[in-house]
A protein has these predicted regions:
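Bacterial N-terminal signal peptides that target proteins for export
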Residues: 1-11
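Catalytic domains of carbohydrate-active enzymes that cleave complex glycans
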Residues: 352-533
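Acidic/histidine-rich, surface-exposed loop or edge segments in extracytoplasmic proteins
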Residues: 40-47, 79-82
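Catalytic-core regions of glycoside hydrolase
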Residues: 39, 57-59, 71-73, 83-116, ...
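Catalytic domains of carbohydrate-active enzymes, especially glycoside hydrolases
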Residues: 51-79
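Bacterial N-terminal signal peptides
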Residues: 9-19
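N-terminal carbohydrate-binding accessory modules
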Residues: 23-40, 48-53
């Protein structure tokens, strides 16, 4: 049979080819790059805090990120904890850090190095090793409008970048932390000009290594933040717009942009930075940072799923998928929210995956890790499940389980530690729910239940040791327990504690006897969740 031909193509084949093109155009679309931000600014226990990780932990995380579907990683290693001039020990730490970049490259990831624009610590901080320093109480804001102060700071920054010279991009946030009231966009631009000069002089591939402004709250803002009725996201607009207007014509090539947004429109910066970036015509240079889509910050460690937030944020920005340079997500303690990382990466690569039911997403991740669905899925959901949804033997079965998948080999801290963490969290959740579910017929019952509930919550805190911006000597506080648990305990106490003083005294003695808290400390903490009146 003779077939009609067009430009040498048989008509049938031409129709098939055109149909394939149309299907591809109408089919699953996604962002061309997916990145993940590792925040090393918090000091608490391994492997929860990224700052506690070893060289091998970072190498494993990069391999895991690659298998989850990411192709970029950004680290904030807190070089701002190194005072000028660099000590021999700090210089060696920077040399060693280059291996971290090599490990990211070995995993097939681009490595972006994050820095703040103008923070530096005093020499006194160097009394401790770099990774053990807490700079938050002692940081100084360098005045970039003071030529002498700026020159000294840029010389110190250049000395560090001379050593850590192999990153694919050098990212600097616009002022959180950093900045100062009245700061001008020209001063923020001067940071990138200085970084460009340092890269051109010392970089391993200066024609490819980008400088990237992280647009977050606007350079020069003064308490313009919060996202409430008196402090809406729109208040940062003039600051961000002025910065973008200065960056556009002033940035040295090669450069990109990292506009960040909050996980909801009416909070913090909302979508202001993305909107202004598009209006400025800078979307093709931009990677969109969907901050807190994966996990809130700061956040107490816990298996909290944010699938609906991830869906909403990625769908919000899907309009830019074809024109922007990709997306980034972040988490404070990635080992606790691996399901969120997985869903973010899969959904960003293929937007149709966002329609996948939650249970199926968790099952898919369990399969990728090579672990039993019937154990991992309820463990990942434990913070949202009632007591009857958490079998009594789940912790022991988790501890006996194994992850046979290749991806499961690369969880920071190791798969055995990971499964033990999940088991400990389930134990805490079960212990807490059991305590507040038991009947109370007298003050002795109330004291026993109050002590048991507190013991469960403090027990989980001792596993992770989260203290916000504190250090290892920071004592237990209810602010280190998730709000939903504290609120539930207060509601229980209000309904069940009648003889307040007697109940608190007896519960405190029980907590002291078990070694949970000292008796005096326990009395103070219990009084906070069982207030009088």
């Amino acid at each position: 049979m003779n077939s009609v031909r067009w430009l040498g193509w048989p008509a049938v084949l031409l129709v098939v080819a055109l149909a394939a093109v149309a299907a591809a155009a109408d089919g699953p679309q996604g962002f061309k790059h997916r990145g993940f931000y590792l925040h090393e600014g918090w000091l608490y226990k391994h492997p929860f805090a990224v700052r506690s990780w070893s060289q091998d932990d970072f190498a494993n995380m990069y391999q895991l990120l690659s298998r989850l579907g990411f192709d970029r990683v950004m680290n904030w290693p807190m070089f701002e904890s190194m005072p000028a001039p660099l000590s021999e020990a700090d210089a060696k730490a920077l040399v060693d850090y280059r291996r971290t970049i090599d490990d990211a490259h070995a995993a097939g990831l681009e490595f972006w190095l994050a820095q703040t624009p103008n923070l530096t610590p005093p020499q006194s901080i160097a009394a401790k090793p770099w990774k053990e320093r807490n700079p938050y109480p002692v940081w100084k804001h360098v005045r970039l409008d003071d030529p002498a102060e700026a020159a000294a700071y840029f010389a110190h920054r250049r000395a560090m970048m001379k050593i850590v010279n192999s990153a694919d991009a050098y990212v600097t946030i616009d002022g959180d932390p950093g900045g100062y009231p009245g700061a001008r966009p020209e001063e923020w631009l001067s940071v990138f000009l200085a970084d460009r000069a340092a890269i051109d002089a010392h970089g391993t591939a200066p024609t490819k290594q980008r400088v990237i402004p992280w647009v977050w709250c606007g350079w020069g803002t003064d308490s313009v933040w919060g996202g409430n009725a008196n402090n809406p996201p729109e208040r940062i607009m003039p600051f961000v717009k002025a910065s973008l207007e200065k960056l556009g014509p002033g940035m040295p090539e090669p450069w990109g942009l990292l506009p960040g947004r909050s996980n909801r429109a009416n909070f913090a910066n909302g979508r202001v930075n993305i909107v202004l970036t598009e209006e400025a015509g800078l979307m093709p240079r931009s990677t969109l940072l969907l901050y807190e889509a994966i996990e809130f910050e700061p956040s107490i460690p816990g298996s909290v799923l944010q699938f609906d937030i991830i869906r909403r944020c990625l769908r919000d920005e899907a309009q830019h998928a074809a024109t922007c340079d990709g997306v980034f997500g972040n988490a404070q303690q990635p080992v606790m929210v691996l399901p969120n990382l997985y869903f973010f990466a899969r959904g960003a690569a293929d937007l149709s995956y966002l329609d996948t039911p939650d249970e199926q997403v968790l099952g898919d991740l369990a399969d990728l890790l090579g672990g039993p669905r019937d154990l991992l899925v309820p463990a990942w959901r434990c913070m949202a499940l009632p007591l009857e949804g958490l079998p009594a033997d789940l912790p022991s079965r988790l501890r006996k389980a194994a992850l046979s998948g290749e991806a499961g080999r690369f969880i920071p801290g190791g798969q055995r530690r990971y499964l033990d963490i999940l088991a400990a969290e389930v134990e805490s959740r079960r212990g807490f729910l059991e305590a507040i579910a038991k009947p109370v017929s007298c003050a002795a019952d109330a004291a026993a239940n109050l002590a048991a509930a507190t013991r469960a919550l403090v027990g989980w805190w001792r596993v992770h040791g989260y203290v916000n911006s504190g250090d290892e000597n920071t004592p237990f506080s209810w602010q280190f327990v998730r709000d939903e648990n504290v609120n539930a305990l207060r509601a229980w106490a209000k309904a069940n504690v009648d003889d307040r003083e007697a109940v608190i005294a007896a519960a405190a003695k029980s907590l002291a006897a078990s070694g949970t808290l000292g008796e005096e400390e326990a009395e103070k903490r219990l009084a906070e969740v069982a207030p009088g009146g």
